[in-house]
């Protein structure tokens, strides 16, 4: 693709992916590279602009991460964020000191609106700060263009060289004008035109896959999740019947999910799909197993065995499709290691299946972009907007040993919970919600008779990035309806509890 490009140099900040996503959301393509990328690599990308991320280090530390000094001589606009601004100042002759008072959280800020970076933005606003050091002397040619009560230099610019820095974080939602500031950098300073669109990505991908594959065979492991579903449909658009998808149904999916996968991909898209009903096989392997990590390992290994058996029936395939997405690439360190990480995306399949090359059509996309591509391709919203679901499925939402009875109980209860959340119009407000069958039984009374049945936990969270999460404040009347339906419609559950723990200290999943 020949899209205009912004490079994000990663100095270890927690928001590096968020910065890249914000740039993409502004219809500008961007890539994340390590801070120590060579100047030749940077030049080869021909970027319209460069963004330095924040980071946990101090520029005063001799071992602090620094970029190639030549990057400032390329004549390309640069925006330094937090550590990125301090680094720019430090490398160009300014000075940085430790602040007497650390700034963390939302603070008031005053912008110099004559700066191109803050053009069209109200002079007084708020921003999100997270720093211990600050710039106290500016490099030659720079001027201050923002300040806060405790940070006299909250933003700097060298208009002639198009070098800009902000001490705050424009990429987070807690900086109300952050997107406007980033847009000013992208469009007014870098001169981007906004040519990153999903429709053009799809067209380019189809042509590229078609050219690469020719008349060869392609194989895809289809789970019914967002990434594998979108990857499969995109590849099918390119090569049609040359693609075969294998859907290993381990019997641990949510209610009706396996049938929906078959209905959508076989009937709607006319994809050559092999559904392997392997519930008995997986449950047999899980007998007596209570440790969640052992469950995961057993299911992962058995999945590979089943897939391998089915793949051998097809014969030699030339290409294996994987749903690797851009965060996988970034987290693996960007570069050769990215391929190694991607191999584990479908449980290590490339180590077992005879193929020549991997196709990763979504490798450059973030999850929200994958969903947009899915919508453009006509995949039903129920699949495209599907919530995160663990690979081992309901096995890690049954606490303790997994049996068919327990899975069936949980599947029915979980379906009611999800159905009532959707009926209440909360399905897009709550980022993830599900039921957990605890290993605990308790005494109850139903129809004047004593019961001794399972306790079911409900979990629902709101989150921006799934790194931290808050429990969802579901209205009591909705919870009451869910509880009444489950105890009346699902056998062997006589008590419902609602998990009101944040992450941290808890994780979102129970196992």
From Swiss-Prot:
Quote the cellular component terms of the Gene Ontology held in the record. Answer: cytosol
Report the catalytic activity.
XMP + L-glutamine + ATP + H2O = GMP + L-glutamate + AMP + diphosphate + 2 H(+)
Task: Tell me the domain of life.
Answer: Bacteria
User: Any idea which UniProt keywords this protein has?
Assistant: ATP-binding, Glutamine amidotransferase, GMP biosynthesis, Ligase, Nucleotide-binding, Purine biosynthesis
The Glutamine amidotransferase type-1 domain covers 5-195
Q: Which residues are responsible for catalysis?
A: 82 (nucleophile), 169, 171
Q: Which GO terms describe its molecular function?
A: ATP binding; GMP synthase activity
InterPro entries from the UniProt entry: Class_I_gatase-like, GATASE, GMP_synth_C, GMP_synth_GATase, GMP_synthase, GMPS_ATP_PPase_dom, NAD/GMP_synthase, Rossmann-like_a/b/a_fold
Pfam families per the UniProt record, alphabetical:
GATase, GMP_synt_C, NAD_synthase
Q: What Enzyme Commission number(s) does the record list for this chain?
A: 6.3.5.2
Annotated GMPS ATP-PPase domain residues? 196-386
In this chain, ATP is annotated as bound at 223-229
Q: Which SUPFAM superfamilies match?
A: Adenine nucleotide alpha hydrolases-like, Class I glutamine amidotransferase-like
Question: In which pathway does this enzyme or protein participate?
Answer: Purine metabolism; GMP biosynthesis; GMP from XMP (L-Gln route): step 1/1
Could you tell me what this protein does? Catalyzes the synthesis of GMP from XMP.
**Subunit-level organization:** Homodimer.
Q: What is this protein called?
A: GMP synthase [glutamine-hydrolyzing]
Please name the source species: Acetivibrio thermocellus (strain ATCC 27405 / DSM 1237 / JCM 9322 / NBRC 103400 / NCIMB 10682 / NRRL B-4536 / VPI 7372)
């Amino acid at each position: 693709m020949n899209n205009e490009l912004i490079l994000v140099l990663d100095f270890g900040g927690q928001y590096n992916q968020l910065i890249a996503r914000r740039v993409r959301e502004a219809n500008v393509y961007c890539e994340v590279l390590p801070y120590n990328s060579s100047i030749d690599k940077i030049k080869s990308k021909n970027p319209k602009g460069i963004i330095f991320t924040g980071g946990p280090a101090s520029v005063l530390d001799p071992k602090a991460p620094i970029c190639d000094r030549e990057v400032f001589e390329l004549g390309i606009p640069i925006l330094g964020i937090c550590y990125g601004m301090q680094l720019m100042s430090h490398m160009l002759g300014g000075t940085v000191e430790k602040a007497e008072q650390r700034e963390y959280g939302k603070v008031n800020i005053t912008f110099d609106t004559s700066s191109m970076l803050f053009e069209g933005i109200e002079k007084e606003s708020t921003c999100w700060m997270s720093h211990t050091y600050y710039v106290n002397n500016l490099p030659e040619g720079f001027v201050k263009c923002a300040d806060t009560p405790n940070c006299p230099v909250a933003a700097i610019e060298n208009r002639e060289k198009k070098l800009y820095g902000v001490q705050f974080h424009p990429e987070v939602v807690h900086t109300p004008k952050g997107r406007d500031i980033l847009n000013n950098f992208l469009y007014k300073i870098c001169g981007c035109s906004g040519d990153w669109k999903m429709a053009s990505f799809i067209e380019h991908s189809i042509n590229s896959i078609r050219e690469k594959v020719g008349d060869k065979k392609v194989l895809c492991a289809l789970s019914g999740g967002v990434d594998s579903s979108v990857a499969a449909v995109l590849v099918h658009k390119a090569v049609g019947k040359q693609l075969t998808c294998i859907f290993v149904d381990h019997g641990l999916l949510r209610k009706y999910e396996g049938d929906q996968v078959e209905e959508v991909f076989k009937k709607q898209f006319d994809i050559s799909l092999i559904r392997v009903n392997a519930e008995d096989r997986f449950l047999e392997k899980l007998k007596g197993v209570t440790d969640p990590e052992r469950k995961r390992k057993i299911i992962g290994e058995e999945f590979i065995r089943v897939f391998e058996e089915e793949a051998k029936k097809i014969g030699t395939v030339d290409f294996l499709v994987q749903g690797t997405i851009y965060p996988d690439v970034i987290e693996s360190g960007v570069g050769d290691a990215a391929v190694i990480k991607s191999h584990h995306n479908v449980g290590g399949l490339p180590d077992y299946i005879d193929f020549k090359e991997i196709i990763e059509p979504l490798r450059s996309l973030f999850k929200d972009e994958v969903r947009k591509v899915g919508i453009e391709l006509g995949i039903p919203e129920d699949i495209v907007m599907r919530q995160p679901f663990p690979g081992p499925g309901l096995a890690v939402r049954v606490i303790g040993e997994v049996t068919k009875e327990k899975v069936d109980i949980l599947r029915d209860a979980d379906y009611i919970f999800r159905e009532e959340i959707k009926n209440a119009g909360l399905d897009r407000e709550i980022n993830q919600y599900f039921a957990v069958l605890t290993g605990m039984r308790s005494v109850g009374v139903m129809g004047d008779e004593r019961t001794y049945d399972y306790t079911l936990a409900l979990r629902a969270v709101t989150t921006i990035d799934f790194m931290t999460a808050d429990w969802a404040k579901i209205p009591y009347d909705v919870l009451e309806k869910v509880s009444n339906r489950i105890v009346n419609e699902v056998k062997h559950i006589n008590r419902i509890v609602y998990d009101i723990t944040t992450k941290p200290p808890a994780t979102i999943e129970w196992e």
